[in-house]
């Protein structure tokens, strides 16, 4: 199995991270310790490594935070290995193929893991975050990073929309200690980022 970074672990869950591809995407595998089953967040790249991880950690489901090219390069490979891939309807057209559509405020269950879906448009129209119930874990894709929101210079991106998503769907409902695990780079917490929202609005990015 490829060496991974363990970003979080407790009695019930562990989070493995592998950094892949030309723009250093974070691929997360969230494993339910009670059943050994896992969910993979963003089949980004380096499919050979991801397939090894999928086998070693018993990945049963892939969910995509959004449809940008750097987050989906291994989608075909994991589907060919028999693992279902889910994405929002708004971003589904960006993927080469998929199996399921994700809806806002729903639950993705793998083993005893329950991932709550949170629609956070702005970076893309169909961007989605995932919170693991009963843990402080929040996977934000390219919506929220240390120091601000994701890039909104792309076609179909919108700065005002991503700010609203962050304020209403992430900062308002989640505790300060919530761990933010983004699609690239290091993690942060809601408490470290939420005081800076007005600064981000003022600077415009």
Please provide the spans of the model-predicted regions.
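Conserved beta-strand hairpin/beta-sheet module of binuclear metal-dependent hydrolase folds
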Residues: 3-57, 130-141
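Divalent metal-coordination and catalytic microenvironments
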Residues: 30, 42, 66, 78, ...
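Short beta-strand or tight-loop elements
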Residues: 11-13, 111-116, 126
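Metallo-beta-lactamase
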Residues: 124-205
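Active-site neighborhood of phospho(di)ester-bond hydrolases with catalytic His/Asp-centered motifs
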Residues: 40-41, 60-68, 85-89, 120-122, ...
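Active-site HxH/HxHxD metal-binding segment of metal-dependent hydrolases
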Residues: 24, 38, 45-116, 195-199
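Short, glycine/acidic-enriched loop or turn micro-motifs at the edges of active sites
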Residues: 34-35, 45, 69, 91, ...
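Short Gly/Pro-enriched turn/cap motifs at secondary-structure boundaries
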Residues: 18-20, 99, 119-121
